[in-house]
Amino acid sequence: MATKAFQKIYTKITQITKATCSLKATGVGYDELATVNGKLAQLVKIAGDDVTLQVFEGTEGIPTNAEVVFLGKSPTLKVSEQLAGRFFNAFGDPIDGGPEIEGQEVEIGGPSVNPVRRKQPSELIATGIAGIDLNNTLVSGQKIPFFADPDQPFNQVMANVALRAETDKIILGGMGMTNDDYLYFKNVFSNAGALDRIVSFMNTTENPQVERLLIPDMALTAAEYFAVNNNEKVLVLLTDMTSYADALAIVSNRMDQIPSKDSMPGSLYSDLAKIYEKAVQFPSGGSITIIAVTTLSGGDITHAVPDNTGYITEGQLFLRRDSDIGKVIVDPFRSLSRLKQLVTGKKTRKDHPQVMNAAVRLYADAANAKTKMENGFDLTNYDERTLAFAKDYSNQLLAIDVNLDTTEMLDVAWGLFGEYFRPEEVNIKKELVDQYWPKGE
């Protein structure tokens, strides 16, 4: 990277760790970029004249007399309509073989939107996945995590959401992905002909881990451009936030900071909140909605990353494998969208809230019946019907490979009610039963 004549050059490094180097410098600011022996770095700590730089590629081969040049700016992204359909690395450079982007250069990582400029979310975000749209409906401007075990197909779910979501733009931020994952997303988007509305920022396992820290800010800067400048409905998909948190822990550890719970930095809550609070519904019509995958270590929901995430976000979505049908579903018991009441029955059909509640209640009755059966108790006729209902409900609605619009989901649910139960057993208002109960049942 070329340096300018007026840029001050430092050549005395006082301390070097695996990811950081320290020196004395003046007139510099937090998050400012620098080059250390030609390697890109970012300023992460200031204590008087003592500053610490995080070197993205690692400090191997850097001597104590290395040339350090501060660039006078934070990481930036060039924003324009040319972003659509492109794949970028953590620095906003194209990695798809296409031309450089032309546009306005914007610093990433700015503040979240002032609350007085926000509008209460009121628009439905449809994904085609019934476990979301039917039971845990999403609203524009919402922030929600996807909790999943590492062996579950969460990237497939993210790709499906990107292709099905009824939004103007999709921004994908991938952190710690394998090259296979990167190629999977690229091929799926290309084959579906959906590249024109998707922007992707990728960090793979072959890239330095600390580069992951830039991915969310890059993705959200692009999202803000489309939401503010074009008044577009933007959905940001981030995967995997556990990889992001691991990178935070690496930097914190190498800066000799005292770790908090599960070896995470004490700033974890603030670092996560800074990302999730970018979700917003603008009065002008544009919006940023965030769905972020957080993988669980051994299914441990009490780990610092999912634990802090739960306090910040507006609900959570859980993936689990249903052993009865052999498919991955969105778990109706552990999932919750805290804003769904803003759109269910208002932006969707009027029977939506009651159908949703009735289906989950019957599914819970089936879980109780299964427990009775496993403990050797006799099953009633109702128990047997709930078990049969639960299997079809999982297969036809909860499975992540099912793609229906909300009206079709409701019709399927009514069909299952009519197949296995009498109207009085589903506990839905008579006026709705009279209108939607399957005829001839």
Model regions: which residues?
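Active-site phosphate-binding and catalytic loops of NTP-dependent enzymes
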Residues: 75-79, 94-99, 116-122, 230, ...
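N-terminal accessory targeting/assembly segments
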Residues: 1-86, 91-95
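P-loop NTPase nucleotide-binding/switch module
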Residues: 66-68, 82, 95-142, 155-160, ...
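A generic structural signal for well-ordered coil/turn residues at beta-strand boundaries
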Residues: 9, 17, 30, 83, ...
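Residues that form or immediately flank small-molecule/cofactor binding pockets and catalytic motifs
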Residues: 18, 48, 92, 113, ...
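Generic beta-structure capping elements
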Residues: 46, 56, 90, 111, ...
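P-loop NTPase catalytic core
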Residues: 134-137, 141-441
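Residue-level signal for beta-strand positions within conserved beta-sheet cores that form or flank
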Residues: 9, 39, 64, 83, ...
